[in-house]
Amino acid sequence: MLPQEIVYTKLSSTETQNGWIDFLTTKPLASQGIEWTPLIPTAHVLSIFMVLFMIAILTAVYYTKLKKLKPTEPPTGYVLVVQLLILQFENLTVDLLGEKNRRLSLLFIIIFVYILISNLMSMVGGIAAPTSSSTVTFSLGLMSFFGTFIMGVKYQKLAYFRDFFVIIKIKKKTIPLMINPLNVIGYFAPLLSISLRLWGNVLAGSIFIALLYSLFRTFFTLWSPSSFSVGLVFGTLAGGLVIPAFHVYFDILVSAIQAFVFVSLMLTYWSQPIKAAENAAEEKGQQMIENQRLNVK
């Protein structure tokens, strides 16, 4: 279901006879017949393929322009913007994940562009933004979740699983006593946080914009009940003059911010096991140096 469908209801002259009373007591959610249909494709499926198609076009255009660019000619326009984006994410990836993981910057660029375009799809009337579906945001969150797990196993090996247990020491040996439920819950918390943050912001923005359009239409139709169609036309025109300013904030600025925040959090989660492994190696090295000093004495 589109976010707009949650807000919009069919208006008629009979619904406006009692003025604001009928408007305030209307229950659009009940009239929509909302029910869970897990195996039936939703409107988001089409918009997902549209986003992928747009990304493919943008990639093809960049490749074509880059191929035509001479080696001595500085990049300009679209090529320059893309290369600045690539450079920015490469630096961010190297700073948080290290030089060895520079190649992963391409993955984060793709995720950023995918989320950005998905968020901007809400500006197209009748098309659902993919990120307004909790399924899409949780799928993206799972990428962050499993990526964190892979990084932990890669850099910390079996020591990564120590945080999930209550450890006791017996004769200088560490023995896992029981599962630590707080740490296990804390491990799944970022998955819920990063997924719900993106989904909630995009869905709330779409619903807010739809409410504004509905407010203008309803106000003008109630203002001129004798001519419902004239009021509807004036309400649509008034909304078209005022609401674009809100589109700039909710659909453009917030879309870019949410895409960057998601990727930044994903990078942060992936970097935590790497930093933990580096800190453990540093402590081990300091302990070895201290032991050597004691042996010399």
Swiss-Prot record:
<dbReference type="GO" id="GO:0045259">
    <property type="term" value="C:proton-transporting ATP synthase complex"/>
</dbReference>
<dbReference type="InterPro" id="IPR035908">
    <property type="entry name" value="F0_ATP_A_sf"/>
</dbReference>
<feature type="transmembrane region" description="Helical">
    <location>
        <begin position="38"/>
        <end position="58"/>
    </location>
</feature>
<keyword id="KW-1003">Cell membrane</keyword>
<dbReference type="InterPro" id="IPR023011">
    <property type="entry name" value="ATP_synth_F0_asu_AS"/>
</dbReference>
<feature type="transmembrane region" description="Helical">
    <location>
        <begin position="77"/>
        <end position="97"/>
    </location>
</feature>
<protein>
    <recommendedName>
        <fullName>ATP synthase subunit a</fullName>
    </recommendedName>
</protein>
<dbReference type="Pfam" id="PF00119">
    <property type="entry name" value="ATP-synt_A"/>
</dbReference>
<keyword id="KW-1133">Transmembrane helix</keyword>
<comment type="similarity">
    <text>Belongs to the ATPase A chain family.</text>
</comment>
<feature type="transmembrane region" description="Helical">
    <location>
        <begin position="230"/>
        <end position="250"/>
    </location>
</feature>
<keyword id="KW-0812">Transmembrane</keyword>
<comment type="subunit">
    <text>F-type ATPases have 2 components, CF(1) - the catalytic core - and CF(0) - the membrane proton channel. CF(1) has five subunits: alpha(3), beta(3), gamma(1), delta(1), epsilon(1). CF(0) has three main subunits: a(1), b(2) and c(9-12). The alpha and beta chains form an alternating ring which encloses part of the gamma chain. CF(1) is attached to CF(0) by a central stalk formed by the gamma and epsilon chains, while a peripheral stalk is formed by the delta and b chains.</text>
</comment>
<comment type="function">
    <text>Key component of the proton channel; it plays a direct role in the translocation of protons across the membrane.</text>
</comment>
<keyword id="KW-0406">Ion transport</keyword>
<feature type="transmembrane region" description="Helical">
    <location>
        <begin position="252"/>
        <end position="272"/>
    </location>
</feature>
<dbReference type="GO" id="GO:0042777">
    <property type="term" value="P:proton motive force-driven plasma membrane ATP synthesis"/>
</dbReference>
<dbReference type="GO" id="GO:0005886">
    <property type="term" value="C:plasma membrane"/>
</dbReference>
<dbReference type="InterPro" id="IPR000568">
    <property type="entry name" value="ATP_synth_F0_asu"/>
</dbReference>
<keyword id="KW-0066">ATP synthesis</keyword>
<feature type="transmembrane region" description="Helical">
    <location>
        <begin position="202"/>
        <end position="222"/>
    </location>
</feature>
<keyword id="KW-0138">CF(0)</keyword>
<feature type="transmembrane region" description="Helical">
    <location>
        <begin position="133"/>
        <end position="153"/>
    </location>
</feature>
<feature type="transmembrane region" description="Helical">
    <location>
        <begin position="174"/>
        <end position="194"/>
    </location>
</feature>
<keyword id="KW-0472">Membrane</keyword>
<keyword id="KW-0375">Hydrogen ion transport</keyword>
<keyword id="KW-0813">Transport</keyword>
<dbReference type="InterPro" id="IPR045082">
    <property type="entry name" value="ATP_syn_F0_a_bact/chloroplast"/>
</dbReference>
<dbReference type="GO" id="GO:0046933">
    <property type="term" value="F:proton-transporting ATP synthase activity, rotational mechanism"/>
</dbReference>
<feature type="transmembrane region" description="Helical">
    <location>
        <begin position="107"/>
        <end position="127"/>
    </location>
</feature>
